[in-house]
Amino acid sequence: GGMKSLFGRAFSGETLFLNKYTAIQPSMIALGSSFPGDILVYDVSQGDIIVQKSSYLASEETVKREISFSKKGTIGFFGGEGFIMNRYFGSGLLFIEIDGTAIEYDLNPGEEMVVNTGNLVAMSSSCHIDVVSVKGIKNKFLGGEGFFNTVVKGPGHVIVQTMPISTLAESLSGFMPQND
C-alpha cells in the first residue's frame, strides 16, 4: 500500500517490500518459515492482534497493519525484543511465524502472566504489557533468563513461543569453534 506503508514497514523492522500472489484459478500456496517452528493462522476479523515485529509471515490483502508502540518507553530500551510491535486489524487471515512451538493462553480481566521478553509473540490488543526487572542479583547473573521479564495483563489472548531464535543461538554458541 504505497510509500506510507513502505516507510512503516522499514521503521518497524520488517522487509520493505511484500510479494503479492494472485490466483487466476482455484489453487494453493505453500508458506515456509525462516526458522523451525509453527505457523499460526489467525483470523483478524475475530479481533485486533498485536504481533512481535519479526513474526509476520503473510496475510490476505484485507488485513491491515499499523505500528503499535508500548506506552512505556523503557520497554523498548530494556525489553530485548523492542517496544515496536505491529497491530493487525481488518478482516482476513494473518500467518504468524513462531520460533519453536506456539502456546496460547486466555487471560481474564486483571490476570497477569510473566514471560521472558523474547518468548512473547502476540496478544490481543486488549492486553497491556510492561517490562519488570528480574529480582535478585543471583537470578540476574546466574539465572540465564536476562535482566527483564515482560508482564502481560488481561483480558485477552496471549501467544508465546518456546524457542526464540536468540535463545537457540545462545544455546548453540558453546558448541561453535572459537577463533583464538
Feature-to-residue mapping (PLM):
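Composition-driven recognition of glycine/serine/threonine/acidic- and proline-rich low-complexity segments
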Residues: 1-180
